[in-house]
């Protein structure tokens, strides 16, 4: 029924658009012919998921996000003055809390231009305030789309989502701001929980994800935009407090996947800024650098995408300000080509480039951009270098912003010169599809240069478990069975994975993909040595929590540092016995190359070989000795098919 409603809505919009198109002259020049800009929708099958560094469709074929940011629903008001005065809005453009341009161009024509620009996906920002705004938008805000008159901002957003997806675009929802106003500075929208709780923020995400769950081309939830310092406090990645962006993203992601839509990609942007931008004081733009040592393991595997933003006027330690708030640190546009490439790698691209680690994931550069009127040599060189790097890296990307004005409401020159596609009051277009825009020479190779296509084979994945501040139960099957060790901190591998490594201290673990588990049956909680057979002492003098025969480790629990229990699951096939003891209480004991990456930085770690499964944990409660994990029992897997 909802698919039918979307189709009807799209048809109405097509008719309304045809009736209301400006008649002064054709508004849209023909697009230059190219492989990515043929005017036809790219063939792909939802939902999307991930395989290593790539996003793939339901057939396992690579789907590269070639995206634009269609902003407006997050707000355009600058935060002071009369909201009805265009001068108080970014670049003089009053979006009225809906995607910009609907006052000037019929939706079908806009979507045709998006396709001509080589795009297959749209990042669609919204504000939490927009979700609750019950006032209809002014008729003038949708003048070119009269079918949208009388609708609230959320209802207009619904119509835009339906039109985009019915036209074949993938849509990634982006929580950009809390209040409907322009981002980003000290604006009250610095964190996901600015002016509200993390639970309330996650509630909004569950609401919106449920709203579109019957539309399979709504493919992703981009959790929050440019998390940054407010007046008094910094965000952090892993401290466990109310400002912990890593933990908040984990909470919202798991709620979206369990309560709303398990098919969505979850997009997590790194931290955009911390500290005071004053020389001599700690400050900077961490972006994705913390992911190397603390990544996310979600309850639904192969759904995680990391994202980052890059603008030439900012830098790794430069706020982007001029005057107050400016430091002597390098901007990206001040770097040499080699410096820029190394910085891009260190801040973001290592996540996708370094395969076979717990943090390996697709990286989406979900914002970058520059003005069509930019004449400076350094900013232009930066844009050339960045787009070249994105092309050579075969990266997923989203330009900011996609749509803007070229004239004011009065018809005089104005609007956002950064927009990829600009429209005057008559709907006439200018931008990268038209003569005279210097950016076209950089944009076209980015969207048309062939990258990887076709099937992407599944490869072993690695998952980090952390009990730093709370439980980390990534298994839906285990969650459904209830609390298996009340009062202890618990960690469980995702369904379809097995435990393969543990840290001696710190409570972290490492899992890897495995189809070893039986499709039915529960789990076994091991709190003593009852399953250690006579003559099978594999860690003399140590307490051994060993899985029953035919079972393997999927989780563990701790009380303080002390091992509390081991969690085991039955295998779908007979498991070999025997094995070896892997000690790690006095140093690392891992396979060559450290597959999975450093999952517990600064702590001793033990890990079974990729050809082994873990069947037991040993520890001691002797005086003056840590009661934390000290050894693993590693046994050979039954064969390649079971690994």
Predicted regions and their residues:
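Aromatic-rich peripheral "rim/lid" segments of glycoside hydrolase catalytic domains that contact
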Residues: 375-460
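N-terminal carbohydrate-binding accessory modules
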Residues: 29-121
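Secretory targeting and sorting signals
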Residues: 1-31
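Extracellular glycoside hydrolase catalytic/binding regions
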Residues: 47, 90-99, 103, 195, ...
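Active-site-proximal beta-strand/loop segments in catalytic clefts of secreted hydrolases
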Residues: 68-73, 125-129, 174-178, 222-227, ...
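N-terminal low-complexity, Pro/Thr-rich disordered segments
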Residues: 20-40, 452-458, 643
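An active-site-proximal structural segment forming one wall of the substrate-binding cleft
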Residues: 94-122, 130-132, 138-220, 247-255, ...
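Lectin-type carbohydrate-recognition ectodomains
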Residues: 458-643
């Amino acid at each position: 029924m909802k698919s039918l409603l979307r189709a009807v809505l799209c048809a109405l919009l097509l008719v309304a658009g045809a009736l209301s198109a400006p008649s002064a002259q054709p508004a849209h020049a023909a697009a230059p012919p190219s492989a990515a800009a043929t005017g036809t929708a790219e063939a792909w099958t939802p939902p999307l998921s991930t395989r290593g560094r790539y996003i793939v469709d339901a057939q396992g074929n690579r789907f590269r996000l070639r995206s634009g940011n269609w902003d407006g629903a997050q707000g355009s008001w600058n935060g002071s003055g009369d909201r009805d005065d265009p001068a108080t809005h970014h670049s003089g453009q009053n979006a009225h809390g809906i995607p910009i341009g609907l006052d000037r161009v019929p939706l079908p024509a806009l979507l045709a231009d998006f396709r001509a620009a080589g795009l297959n996906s749209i990042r669609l920002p919204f504000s939490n305030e927009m979700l609750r705004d019950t006032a209809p938008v002014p008729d003038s805000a949708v003048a070119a789309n009269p079918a949208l008159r009388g609708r609230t901002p959320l209802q207009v957003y619904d119509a835009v989502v339906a039109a985009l997806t019915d036209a074949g675009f993938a849509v990634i929802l982006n929580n950009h701001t809390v209040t409907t106003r322009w981002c980003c500075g000290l604006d009250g929208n610095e964190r996901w929980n600015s002016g509200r709780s993390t639970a309330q923020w996650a509630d909004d995400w569950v609401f919106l994800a449920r709203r579109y769950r019957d539309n399979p081309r709504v493919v992703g939830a981009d959790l929050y935009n440019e998390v940054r310092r407010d007046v008094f406090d910094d965000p952090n990645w892993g401290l466990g407090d109310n400002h912990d962006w890593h933990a908040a993203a984990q909470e919202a992601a798991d709620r979206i996947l369990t309560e709303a839509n398990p098919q969505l990609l979850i997009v997590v942007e790194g931290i955009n800024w911390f500290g005071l931008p004053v020389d001599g004081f700690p400050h900077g733009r961490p972006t994705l650098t913390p992911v190397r040592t603390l990544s996310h393991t979600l309850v639904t595997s192969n759904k995680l995408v990391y994202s980052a933003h890059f603008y030439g006027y900012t830098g790794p330690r430069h706020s982007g300000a001029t005057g107050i708030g400016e430091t002597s640190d390098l901007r990206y546009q001040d770097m040499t080509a080699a410096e820029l490439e190394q910085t891009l790698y260190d801040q973001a691209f290592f996540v996708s480039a370094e395969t076979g680690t717990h943090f390996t994931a697709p990286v989406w550069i979900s914002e970058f951009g520059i003005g069509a009127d930019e004449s400076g040599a350094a900013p232009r060189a930066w844009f050339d270098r960045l787009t070249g790097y994105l092309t050579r890296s075969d990266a997923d990307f989203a330009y900011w912003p996609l749509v803007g004005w070229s004239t004011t409401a009065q018809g005089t020159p104005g609007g956002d010169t950064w927009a990829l596609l600009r429209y005057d009051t008559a709907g006439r277009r200018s931008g990268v599809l038209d003569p005279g825009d210097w950016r076209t020479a950089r944009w076209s190779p980015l969207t048309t240069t062939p990258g990887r296509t076709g099937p992407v084979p599944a490869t072993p994945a690695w998952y980090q478990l952390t009990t730093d501040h709370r439980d980390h139960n990534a298994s839906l099957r285990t969650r459904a069975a209830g609390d298996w060790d009340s009062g202890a901190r618990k960690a469980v591998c995702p369904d379809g994975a097995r435990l393969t490594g543990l840290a001696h201290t710190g409570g972290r673990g490492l899992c890897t993909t495995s189809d070893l588990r039986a499709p039915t049956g529960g789990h076994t909680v091991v709190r003593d040595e009852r399953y250690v057979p006579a003559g099978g002492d594999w860690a003399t003098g140590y307490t051994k929590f060993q899985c029953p025969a035919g079972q393997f480790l999927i989780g563990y629990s701790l009380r303080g540092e002390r091992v509390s229990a081991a969690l085991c699951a039955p295998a779908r096939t007979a498991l070999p016995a025997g094995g070896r003891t892997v000690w790690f209480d006095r140093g690392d004991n891992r396979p060559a190359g450290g597959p999975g990456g450093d999952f517990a930085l600064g702590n001793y770690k033990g890990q079974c070989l990729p050809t082994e499964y873990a069947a037991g944990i040993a520890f001691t409660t002797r005086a003056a000795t840590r009661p934390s994990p000290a050894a693993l029992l590693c046994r050979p897997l039954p064969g390649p098919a079971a690994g």
